[in-house]
């Protein structure tokens, strides 16, 4: 049989053309607010990283020029150096006390590339009640989605910050410096709380101590890249490891994907063959993609798997302890592998350490080995991650340690996982 062939019609396709330049009237309002603010804060997120390294440099120039404090979400770590004097540390559910308190009490919040997610805001009706809020984001759907803002600026972070800086300089680089000095004095009082302090042990390795030693022994490496899995170890890594540049911290934030870190570290190592690439992991997350050790061995990738092994699903166990009356379910394992033997079976190097006195030597052995390493660090099984904003509570109500947890979480918060 024969017939006429009729080709498919060309389907119409939509195009995404993001707006790069921000509205000049809104930028003017932001500059005016910067000039007048008495208690400002820069609240930064992953959008700064995504905008490119130029955005981070412009941000640093703006922070230095204004002397405003700066905090960051989990995904924005590295956009401003952790060694910088204006750095307050990460904010949010497991963020630092001084960062969360400054966010709550500020009179000007400048959101740059963050999304006001629930781990940052706490209870929305109590979120930073007295502040004027500006929000710079390339995605218009993120503006006013969760928190109403007073100064919305849609555009690419680098383009907008460049315009903000140029306008602020042209107007005389003014700030309310006397008021900002008082603001820094208040922040100093919050810093004196020392919210990351913990009770160390000479018998068992505390996970915080393990990461402090890892930081001390690796922070001089400019080519250090850190990946993580998801859980308590991820939060401790964000608290105790410092990042000086963007794109040196790879983690699964909003999605919270257990199993992400190991394949991510392989990708980073392939992209940077000579770099030091460390995946900070929990044993449960790491086992979700353990088969990738075969990839690391096959391609001779010197990735370091730094497992904080508490034999628990630590974050799940912590929530069950604090929110659900210690009714534990499916948050531990009695059938974990011997990770040293597992590494050997793959043809990698395995190291196990359980004594705090041996930790530094074990870390140095891991760092000096030119090949993939599975580092099994046996840590305190029931250590909780603090500070912590309880679910259903405002972001200025934080648990700072075990002594603050009793009756801290109501029944309404217990359902907000």
PLM feature spans:
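Glycine-rich phosphate/diphosphate-binding loops that line cofactor/substrate pockets in enzymes
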Residues: 26-42, 62, 103-105, 213-221, ...
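Short internal beta-strands
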Residues: 67-74, 134-137, 303-309
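A short, gly/pro- and small-residue-rich
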Residues: 57-66, 121-140, 246, 387-403
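Glycine-rich, acidic loop regions that bind phosphate or pyrophosphate groups
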Residues: 76-183, 363
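Gly-rich Lys/Arg/Thr-decorated short loops/hinges at beta-loop-alpha junctions or inter-strand turns
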Residues: 2-15, 81-82, 186-198, 247-248, ...
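Conformationally flexible catalytic loops at phosphate/diphosphate-handling active centers
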Residues: 1-34, 195-196, 400
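Active-site diphosphate/adenylate-binding microenvironment
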Residues: 186-263, 268
